[in-house]
Amino acid sequence: MKIGLFFGSFNPIHVGHLIIGNYILNNTELDQVWYVISPQNPFKSQSGLLNEYHRLHLVNIAIEGEPGLKVCNIEFGLPKPSYTIDTLTYLEEKYPGVNFAIIMGEDSFTNLDKWKSGSIIKERYELYVYRRNGEAVYKAEDNKVYLVNAPLLNISSSYVREQIKAGKSIRYLVTDPVYNEIMKAGYYR
């Protein structure tokens, strides 16, 4: 089995995240895509970060009914901040025989050398890097890096949070279940 790990804070998960995961699942040889909720990203501020269990719940309800998309809370039990290499090591021990690949944005890929053990990640794992233009999945010069031209929306979780704080609608930026939960719970106000 081959699983793509899509790491993120998902604060909150929005339709852009779902489009990328779905596209990669349908247009690569990956059997599943796991949304790995990062409780604490070492490169991001904790300010405005919704509780990790609330974010986990939002991802769960966003992908409900999609058999190839899964949520993974493995980093909740690991030391914080979360480092991708440590999570990968733990997952390989827990799931022997599973081949893990990493899904990341072009911005993260260009900064991979700044990550803890970034060069080891590049050596050992296939990387699915999503871009903002183009039409198909193709192999880059590096035989472990696939440039994925998924349809992308120019939205971000920070934009969704800003809209909520400003009292504006986020109805079409997130799935209906996520929208309903955010409104009901009063998240990000």
Write out the residue ranges for each language-model feature.
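Nucleotidyltransferase catalytic core that binds NTPs
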Residues: M1-R189
